[in-house]
Amino acid sequence: MNYYISDLHLFHEASIGFDGRPFRNLEEMHAEIVRKWNSKVTNGDTVYILGDMSMRGKNEDLIALVAILKGKKVLIRGNHDDVSDLRYRQLFQEVCDYREIRDSVGGKSYELVLCHYPIFSWKHMSRGTILLYGHTHNSPEDMYFQKCLEGMKDNECRHTGDSHVQAYNVGCMKPWMDYEPRSLQEIICLLYTSPSPRDISGSR
């Protein structure tokens, strides 16, 4: 099983405030993330972390925390990721800036583009390829990005074609993510039933 998540910002105390995260402190946030992750992910699963796993890669506590997270971890590097410490880098099966994979929902296969940053025009977007991204958290920039994609579709831009353009923010603070890795099926289903429709304008 493949799972996806972004922008955990481990050991970044300021993220609790600017994301409005429902935790009193880092210890509480870390404990809940580990609990949700390890109650769901097995060591046979692959978790694609779409950037900003943490603010520091040379922290003994960070290395110890990430080491106990189950599964094969692939880090799609974000602007805050520091993997210069070999001990930390070796916790990931792969570290890269961009990835193209296939996943399935209900027996139907999908092409996915994985990147920390939202991409305005991605490979095969008109053929139904899904973009998973992070970086923008709950910011106005994320809403504008989604509105731009919807505008491209409405104006029949050639790279959008006739298909529904699918771009999903997998930031852990999003209502449909709720601080745990999600499968592609969960992301799609939970996003459309999110109690916060203002966060999912346009094509999500």
Spans of features found by a protein language model:
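Core catalytic region of metal-dependent phosphoesterases/phosphodiesterases
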Residues: Y3-E100
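Short, glycine/acidic-enriched loop or turn micro-motifs at the edges of active sites
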Residues: L10, M55, D81-D82, I119, ...
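Short glycine-/acidic-enriched loop or helix-start segments at secondary-structure transitions
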Residues: A14-S15, K58-E60, D85-R87, K123-H124, ...
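Short glycine-rich loop/turn motifs that provide flexible caps or phosphate-binding loops at active sites
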Residues: L50, R77, Y133, V170, ...
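Conserved beta-sheet core of the metallophosphoesterase superfamily
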Residues: R89-S194
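Single conserved hydrophobic/aromatic residue that forms the stacking wall/gate
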Residues: Y192-R204
